[in-house]
Structures are given as structure tokens and as C-alpha cells.
């Protein structure tokens, strides 16, 4: 009832050639967005299996306003609640209303993922056995999550709860090399020399 997932993807690829196909490019980029809503599915199922089926989803009476109008077995408020106008709360050690378990919890997560890669290959004019090749790739991922528990819930009655998490990470990798390949009769020679470097970073907070 309160879980879903939405996703959007797109990508592009371009591979042009120049100078009589001696200079070749290959560019690829991808983007993905995802949005999810999570629920306390296990808690809801467990309570649904043990809930008295003769009880209504919503309660009748003034006291049920302290639990959002849902039917719950009630008890007097705890000593931690000093508000004189708040008199009742959901009883502990008893089955909770499974609909209230779902409706009183909201967790929304969003993520963005962007990646790209560019490759360049140059075949030397007049000396086509020698190739110069370079490539660079990068990826960036950003994720956020908001968690809200209603003040009418069993777990956080009166006080409620709000939590926030945000994390992002990125990586960059690059390489460049020269390659010489030639066949001498029945013999092949292939020589390559180059360098490669990468960088990774991650940050998160709540």
C-alpha cells in the first residue's frame, strides 16, 4: 500500500571518425534517476496476522485522536509525556493496527547516477601501425533519504521522528598509451606503453 518505486533512464552514444578514419572518438553517457518509498512491511504483516479481525481499522471515540484515529488498544500516556492535554497512547506488548503501522511511517529515497566515458584513438598517418589512445571516464552518484514517523505512531507516540541522510560519491579514471603492432612474416610484434590514474571520493552526512 505504501511502497513504490519510480525510475527513469536515458543514455547517449556518439562515435564519429575523422581524417579518413585515422582519428576516432567514442563518447557514452548514461543518466538514471530513482525514487522509492519504503514501508515497515515486516511489522505490518506480522501485526496483520495476529490482529483481531473483528476490530475496525478506525476507532470510535475521543481517545483515538491520540493515535491518529486508528483503532488501537490504548493505555495511559507514559511518564515521558508531560503534556497535560495528551492523555492516551497505544498499549505496549499487544498487536498494533497494521494499517496504522503503514500509514504512520514514511521513508522517501531519491538517487541520481550519472556516468560518462570518452575514448580517443589516433592512427598515425604514414605509420598506421602506431596508435595513440586515451580514455577518461567518470561516475557521480547522489542519494538522499527522508524518514518520518508520525507522532500518532506506537513507536514514537507524541514525539514523532524525523531523520535525514545524504551521501554522494564520484570516481574519475583516465588512461593514455601508445601501441605499436606489426607483423613481420610469421612473427607478430606488439609493444605498448602508457599510464593510468584513478580517483575516488565519498561523502555522507545526516
Located regions from the model:
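Surface-exposed loop/interface segments of Gram-negative outer-membrane beta-barrel transport/assembly proteins
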Residues: 15-115, 133-206
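Transmembrane beta-barrel architecture of outer membranes
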Residues: 5-11
Amino acid at each position: 500500500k505504501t511502497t513504490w518505486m519510480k525510475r527513469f533512464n536515458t543514455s547517449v552514444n556518439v562515435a564519429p571518425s575523422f581524417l579518413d578514419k585515422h582519428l576516432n572518438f567514442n563518447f557514452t553517457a548514461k543518466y538514471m534517476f530513482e525514487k522509492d518509498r519504503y514501508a515497515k512491511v515486516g511489522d505490518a504483516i506480522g501485526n496483520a496476522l495476529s490482529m483481531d479481525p473483528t476490530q475496525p481499522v478506525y476507532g470510535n471515540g475521543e481517545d483515538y485522536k491520540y493515535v491518529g484515529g486508528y483503532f488501537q488498544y490504548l493505555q495511559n500516556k507514559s511518564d515521558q509525556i508531560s503534556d497535560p492535554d495528551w492523555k492516551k497512547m497505544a498499549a505496549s506488548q499487544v498487536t498494533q493496527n497494521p494499517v496504522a503501522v503503514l500509514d504512520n511511517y514514511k521513508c522517501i529515497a531519491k538517487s541520481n547516477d550519472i556516468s560518462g566515458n570518452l575514448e580517443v584513438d589516433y592512427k598515425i598517418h604514414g605509420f598506421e601501425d602506431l596508435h595513440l589512445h586515451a580514455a577518461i571516464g567518470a561516475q557521480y552518484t547522489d542519494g538522499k533519504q527522508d524518514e518520518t514517523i508520525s507522532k500518532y505512531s506506537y513507536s514514537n507516540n507524541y514525539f514523532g521522528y524525523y531523520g535525514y541522510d545524504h551521501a554522494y560519491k564520484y570516481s574519475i579514471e583516465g588512461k593514455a598509451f601508445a601501441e605499436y603492432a606489426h607483423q613481420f612474416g610469421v612473427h607478430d610484434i606488439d609493444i605498448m606503453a602508457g599510464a593510468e590514474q584513478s580517483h575516488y571520493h565519498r561523502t555522507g552526512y545526516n
